[in-house]
From Swiss-Prot:
Keyword set, alphabetical order: DNA-binding, Restriction system
Name this protein carries in UniProt: Putative type I specificity subunit S.MpnORF89P
Gene Ontology molecular-function annotations: DNA binding
Source species taxonomy: Bacteria, Bacillati, Mycoplasmatota, Mycoplasmoidales, Mycoplasmoidaceae
Assembly information from the UniProt record: The methyltransferase is composed of M and S polypeptides.
The organism of origin for this protein: Mycoplasma pneumoniae (strain ATCC 29342 / M129 / Subtype 1)
Function of the protein: The specificity (S) subunit of a type I methyltransferase (MTase); this subunit dictates DNA sequence specificity. The single R subunit has multiple frameshifts and is probably not expressed.
Cross-referenced InterPro entries: Restrct_endonuc_typeI_TRD (IPR000055), Restrct_endonuc_typeI_TRD_sf (IPR044946), Type-I_RE_S_subunit (IPR051212)
Amino acid sequence: MGRIKTYDFDGEYVTWTTRWSYAGSIYYRNGKFSASSNCGILKVLNKEINPKFLAYALKKEAKKFVNTTSAIPILRTQKVVEIPIDFPPLQIQEKIATILDTFTELSAELSAELSAELSAELSAELRERKKQYAFYRDYLLNLKNWKEENKYYKLGEIAQKVLVGGEKPADFSKEKNEVYKYPILSNNSKAEEFLVYSKTFRVEEKSITVSARGTIGAVFYRDFAYLPAVSLICFVPKEEFDIRFLFHALRAIKFKKQGSATGQLTVAQFKEYGIHVPSLKKQKEIAAILDPLYSFFTDLNEGIPAEIELRKKQLDYYQNFLFNWVQNQKAASIL
C-alpha cells in the first residue's frame, strides 16, 4: 500500500480486494483515500445500515463467494451484491460493531505483543538450534568425515521418478471429505499448507518436494498421497536409498534460480544436482541423528505462528457468535 497527494473518496466506505490471493478481503474505510483497479468500493446510502457492521458482516461471508476455479481468484461486484446479510436494528448493529472493534483491537495488540515477546525470547534460541542442525547436517554429509566408501550420484540417478505439479484442477473442495481427500500442495516454504483438496493424486509414495519457483529450494518430506500444484517438484527415490537421509541431503543443497527474470528450477536442472551417498546402513545412521535435531529446530520455529493463529480463531469465534445471534433473532421473529 502506498500514498499519493490526491484522493478520490472521502467518508465511510466498505472496500474489498477483487482479485489475486487476497480476493474477498474486506476493509472498513473512514477518511480520504484512493483505490487501485483491484479494489471494489461500496458506499452505504441506507441510514438504517451501519457501515462498520456491514464490513464485519461481509468479512464473515465474502470469502465464500470468491471464484477460485479460474487461474486468478476473483470476487466480482455482481457477486458482492448477491451476498445475503441479516441486519438487526441500527442500535444493535452499532453495539455489535463496537464489540468487534474491541475484540479486533485486543487481538491485534495481543498478537503484536506475543510476537514481539516470543520473538525476543526465542530468536536467539531459534538461531542457535538452526546453527546446531546445520552444523551437524553439514558435518555428517561431508564425505571427508566418512571412514567408509561412498559414491557420487546425480539426483536423476537416485530417483525412481521426478515430476512437477500442474494447474489446480477445476473440480476440487475447500474442505476435506471422503471424496475430496487428497491435499493439493502449493509451491511455498511451509511444510503444510493445504488450501484445497482433490479427488485424485499424482504421488502416493513417500516423497520429497522442492519449491521450483518463488522460495526456490524449500525442501519438505511428505508421507501421504497428494496432488502437487504448479512449480512444485516431487522427488521419489529408489528403494536402495534412505529417503530421510536424502531429505537432509537435499536441504543442504543450494538450489539456484535459472532462466527467466523471475527464475525457476526445472526438473532437468534438478536432476543434474548431485550428492555423495554412503551405504544404506550409514544413510540410516545419519538420518537417525539428524531427524530429532530437525524436529527440535522446527518445533520452536512454528510456535509463534501457532499462538497468533489461536488469537485469530478466538476473534473468529466471537464474530461468528454475534452474527449467529443476529440470524437466530430473525428466525425467532418470523416464528
